[in-house]
Amino acid sequence: QREMKKKGIAVELARTVTATTPTGTGVSVEIGASPFVEVANPPAPRTLEADAVCVTVGRVPHTDGLGLDAAGVKVNARGWIEADDFLETSVPGVYAIGDVIGPRRIMLAHMAVAEAHTAVHNILHPEDRKAQRYDVVPSAIFTAPEIGDVGLSEAQAKQQGFAVKTSVFQFRELGK
């Protein structure tokens, strides 16, 4: 974020675009709190002025036709399958992994593979079930410079009672 800020690029976290309005010189963009990220103090809605807007496409659940209602598997209002921390659905013994469990989890292929391993473990070893961990998955945004993270933020670690020590490594010093 610091490197983006140096380049004059603002990074808005836990936000979503709620409206856009063309202006004579660009576009007015209204942003509000993201429906996909839970934060203690959601940022207040605000309006930004921009030269242009890059639109990215989200995901929708493809659960129609799976017979979830007949099986008794619950889905939320948006159609995502509801699963607990062990990836078990509302029907005991029925597990769900991958994109069908929705955007409150990490929707990437390598995460679905990890979820599959967890679900299979829980099916084969019901006496030793394991919760799927999402706090140790690396994340990256491929911009210049790149933005990435893994694990808890400093604030989250402090909130969970960890003794926190931080240090900084400048990626510009890393050979590519």
Locations of the language-model features?
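A conserved beta-strand/loop element that lines the FAD pocket in flavoprotein oxidoreductases
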Residues: 5-17
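FAD-site-proximal beta/loop scaffold in flavoenzymes
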Residues: 11, 38, 46-126
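A structural preference for short, hydrophobic beta-strand core positions in alpha/beta folds
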Residues: 11-13, 31, 166
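Mid-to-C-terminal Rossmann-like scaffold of FAD/NAD(P)H-dependent oxidoreductases
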Residues: 17-19, 28, 59-62, 100-176
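Conserved beta-strand-loop-beta-strand element in the redox core of flavoprotein oxidoreductases
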Residues: 21-47, 53
